[in-house]
Regions:
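Acidic, polar-rich N-terminal leader regions of halophilic archaeal proteins
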Residues: 1-179
Length: 179
């Protein structure tokens, strides 16, 4: 019998939320560490993005392997699984790297706040298992819909913060000239 409704693998939404928050704060902390890094900035960004992506995929795989009520193995077809996992890895990496670059190069705080929110949501959503779609469905939907939507949201937030900062800066300059 198919399970039509997903259930929380950790049995408590609070535990899932705290797990998501912890991982999100570690991810945001990685941006701060990269900011203080004296090594090659590009290499640090690639390592940080890869670590973030590996962590997100580890949560997804770990929850499915440890907490799936009715074993639903990953699809045996590597031509289906590998592209989805590969694109998910790329999306998770790009999310972290984009937030880090916007924060480090332009000083945009909205990028780090966005990273915390998106990471929290990703981990929280990954703790829900057992729906009819199977183990790969959640990751597939992330690749096709949620991931690109979150990157679009980041672009809007970053653009909005830049506009507000420029406007405030122009207002300050005008006030100083009128004195």
């Amino acid at each position: 019998m198919l399970q039509l409704a997903a259930h929380n693998a950790l049995r408590s939404p609070i535990v899932s939320a705290l797990l998501g928050l912890g991982i999100a704060l570690v991810s945001a902390g990685g941006v701060a560490v990269t900011h203080r890094c004296d090594a090659d900035r590009r290499a640090a960004l690639l390592v940080g993005g890869s670590a973030h992506a590996a962590g997100m995929l580890a949560v997804w795989v770990g929850v499915r392997l440890c907490f799936w009520r009715h074993p639903a193995p990953l699809p045996g077809s590597l031509p289906v699984v590998l592209p989805v996992v590969g694109v998910a890895f790329l999306l998770f990496s790009v999310q972290w790297i984009a937030a880090a670059v916007l924060s480090l190069s332009y000083g945009l705080q909205s990028a780090v706040v966005w990273l915390v929110g998106v990471t929290w949501y990703t981990v929280y959503a990954a703790t829900f298992v057992g729906n009819e779609g199977g183990a790969l469905f959640a990751l597939f939907s992330w690749v096709l819909v949620i991931g690109p939507a979150t990157l679009t949201l980041l672009a809007v937030l970053a653009g909005g913060e830049r506009v507000v900062r420029r406007r405030l800066s122009a207002d300050r300059e005008t006030d100083e000239r009128t004195r």
